[in-house]
Amino acid sequence: VRGRLLAELAACPEPGDPEMINRLPYLGAVVNEVLRIHPVAMLMFPRLVEEPLELAGRAFEPGDVLIGCIQAVHERSELYPDPLRFDPQRFLERSYGPGEFLPFGGGARRCLGAALAVYEMKLILATLLQGFSLRLTPASNRPLPPRRRGFTLGPSRPVRLQVT
Protein backbone atom coordinates (compact mmCIF):
# COMPACT_ATOMS: atom_id res chain seq x y z
CA VAL A 1 0.00 0.00 0.00
CA ARG A 2 2.77 2.43 0.97
CA GLY A 3 4.70 1.77 -2.24
CA ARG A 4 1.65 2.31 -4.41
CA LEU A 5 0.79 5.52 -2.56
CA LEU A 6 4.33 6.84 -2.98
CA ALA A 7 4.25 5.99 -6.70
CA GLU A 8 0.94 7.83 -7.12
CA LEU A 9 2.27 10.85 -5.23
CA ALA A 10 5.50 10.84 -7.28
CA ALA A 11 3.49 10.79 -10.52
CA CYS A 12 1.37 13.74 -9.40
CA PRO A 13 2.06 16.63 -11.83
CA GLU A 14 1.91 19.20 -9.03
CA PRO A 15 2.89 17.37 -5.81
CA GLY A 16 2.59 20.49 -3.64
CA ASP A 17 -0.90 21.40 -4.88
CA PRO A 18 -3.50 20.39 -2.26
CA GLU A 19 -6.29 20.21 -4.84
CA MET A 20 -4.25 17.86 -7.02
CA ILE A 21 -3.45 15.66 -4.00
CA ASN A 22 -7.15 15.63 -3.07
CA ARG A 23 -8.00 14.08 -6.48
CA LEU A 24 -5.53 11.16 -6.33
CA PRO A 25 -7.63 7.99 -6.67
CA TYR A 26 -5.54 5.51 -4.69
CA LEU A 27 -4.97 7.99 -1.86
CA GLY A 28 -8.75 8.47 -1.71
CA ALA A 29 -9.28 4.71 -1.67
CA VAL A 30 -6.80 4.30 1.22
CA VAL A 31 -8.52 7.02 3.25
CA ASN A 32 -11.93 5.45 2.56
CA GLU A 33 -10.70 2.03 3.63
CA VAL A 34 -9.29 3.48 6.86
CA LEU A 35 -12.67 5.13 7.52
CA ARG A 36 -14.51 1.90 6.70
CA ILE A 37 -12.48 -0.14 9.18
CA HIS A 38 -12.21 2.67 11.75
CA PRO A 39 -15.33 4.83 11.39
CA VAL A 40 -15.49 8.07 13.34
CA ALA A 41 -18.49 6.79 15.32
CA MET A 42 -19.96 3.34 15.85
CA LEU A 43 -23.61 4.41 15.90
CA MET A 44 -25.74 6.89 14.00
CA PHE A 45 -28.08 9.35 15.68
CA PRO A 46 -31.42 7.81 16.72
CA ARG A 47 -34.21 8.00 14.15
CA LEU A 48 -37.91 8.01 15.01
CA VAL A 49 -40.15 5.78 12.88
CA GLU A 50 -42.91 8.01 11.48
CA GLU A 51 -45.00 5.44 9.62
CA PRO A 52 -45.18 1.63 9.66
CA LEU A 53 -41.96 0.17 8.30
CA GLU A 54 -40.60 -3.28 7.55
CA LEU A 55 -36.85 -3.59 7.65
CA ALA A 56 -34.87 -6.82 7.36
CA GLY A 57 -38.04 -8.83 7.94
CA ARG A 58 -39.01 -6.97 11.12
CA ALA A 59 -41.97 -4.65 11.56
CA PHE A 60 -41.57 -1.24 13.18
CA GLU A 61 -44.38 1.04 14.24
CA PRO A 62 -44.61 4.84 14.47
CA GLY A 63 -42.84 6.00 17.61
CA ASP A 64 -40.24 3.22 17.55
CA VAL A 65 -36.63 4.42 17.72
CA LEU A 66 -34.00 2.97 15.37
CA ILE A 67 -30.26 3.42 15.68
CA GLY A 68 -28.01 2.38 12.80
CA CYS A 69 -24.69 0.69 13.55
CA ILE A 70 -22.05 2.03 11.16
CA GLN A 71 -19.50 -0.62 12.05
CA ALA A 72 -21.99 -3.44 11.36
CA VAL A 73 -22.70 -2.02 7.89
CA HIS A 74 -18.98 -1.68 7.15
CA GLU A 75 -18.37 -5.32 8.14
CA ARG A 76 -21.10 -6.85 5.98
CA SER A 77 -19.35 -9.48 3.86
CA GLU A 78 -21.89 -9.18 1.03
CA LEU A 79 -20.80 -5.53 0.64
CA TYR A 80 -17.15 -5.90 1.60
CA PRO A 81 -15.73 -9.38 0.91
CA ASP A 82 -13.26 -10.34 3.64
CA PRO A 83 -14.34 -7.25 5.60
CA LEU A 84 -11.61 -7.37 8.26
CA ARG A 85 -8.82 -7.22 5.63
CA PHE A 86 -7.42 -3.80 4.74
CA ASP A 87 -8.05 -3.55 0.98
CA PRO A 88 -8.19 -0.05 -0.54
CA GLN A 89 -8.61 -1.60 -3.99
CA ARG A 90 -12.29 -2.31 -3.19
CA PHE A 91 -12.98 1.45 -3.42
CA LEU A 92 -11.44 1.61 -6.89
CA GLU A 93 -13.46 -1.35 -8.17
CA ARG A 94 -16.86 -0.36 -6.84
CA SER A 95 -18.85 2.72 -5.87
CA TYR A 96 -20.69 2.33 -2.59
CA GLY A 97 -24.09 3.90 -2.01
CA PRO A 98 -24.99 6.19 0.89
CA GLY A 99 -26.42 3.27 2.89
CA GLU A 100 -23.34 1.12 2.29
CA PHE A 101 -20.48 3.46 3.24
CA LEU A 102 -21.23 5.93 6.00
CA PRO A 103 -18.20 6.64 8.18
CA PHE A 104 -19.64 10.04 9.13
CA GLY A 105 -23.27 8.92 9.43
CA GLY A 106 -25.85 9.44 6.74
CA GLY A 107 -28.82 11.40 5.56
CA ALA A 108 -29.74 14.84 6.84
CA ARG A 109 -27.77 14.28 10.04
CA ARG A 110 -24.50 13.36 8.32
CA CYS A 111 -21.46 15.09 9.81
CA LEU A 112 -21.16 18.60 8.36
CA GLY A 113 -17.37 18.42 8.53
CA ALA A 114 -17.01 15.12 6.64
CA ALA A 115 -15.60 16.62 3.42
CA LEU A 116 -13.12 18.78 5.36
CA ALA A 117 -12.04 15.82 7.51
CA VAL A 118 -11.39 13.62 4.44
CA TYR A 119 -9.53 16.47 2.72
CA GLU A 120 -7.33 16.94 5.79
CA MET A 121 -6.69 13.19 6.07
CA LYS A 122 -5.49 13.07 2.46
CA LEU A 123 -3.18 16.07 2.85
CA ILE A 124 -1.71 14.85 6.14
CA LEU A 125 -1.17 11.30 4.87
CA ALA A 126 0.46 12.57 1.65
CA THR A 127 2.72 14.95 3.58
CA LEU A 128 3.79 12.29 6.08
CA LEU A 129 4.46 9.66 3.42
CA GLN A 130 6.51 12.02 1.28
CA GLY A 131 8.68 13.20 4.16
CA PHE A 132 8.98 10.29 6.56
CA SER A 133 9.09 6.54 6.94
CA LEU A 134 6.63 5.35 9.59
CA ARG A 135 6.67 1.95 11.29
CA LEU A 136 4.62 0.57 14.15
CA THR A 137 6.72 -0.33 17.17
CA PRO A 138 6.54 -4.01 18.20
CA ALA A 139 4.24 -3.11 21.13
CA SER A 140 1.78 -1.42 18.74
CA ASN A 141 1.93 -4.10 16.05
CA ARG A 142 -1.03 -6.12 17.31
CA PRO A 143 -4.81 -5.79 16.98
CA LEU A 144 -6.13 -2.57 18.42
CA PRO A 145 -9.79 -2.67 19.47
CA PRO A 146 -11.64 0.66 19.36
CA ARG A 147 -12.62 2.52 22.50
CA ARG A 148 -15.63 4.75 22.75
CA ARG A 149 -14.72 8.34 23.60
CA GLY A 150 -18.04 10.09 24.04
CA PHE A 151 -19.78 9.92 20.68
CA THR A 152 -16.66 9.04 18.68
CA LEU A 153 -14.30 6.06 18.58
CA GLY A 154 -10.57 6.08 19.17
CA PRO A 155 -7.76 3.62 19.84
CA SER A 156 -7.96 1.76 23.15
CA ARG A 157 -4.27 2.32 23.81
CA PRO A 158 -1.52 4.58 22.42
CA VAL A 159 -0.32 3.85 18.90
CA ARG A 160 3.45 4.15 18.94
CA LEU A 161 5.32 4.83 15.72
CA GLN A 162 8.98 4.85 14.78
CA VAL A 163 9.56 7.88 12.54
CA THR A 164 12.65 8.15 10.32
Residue positions per predicted region:
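Cytochrome P450 heme-binding "Cys pocket" and the immediately downstream C-terminal segment
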Residues: 1, 116-151
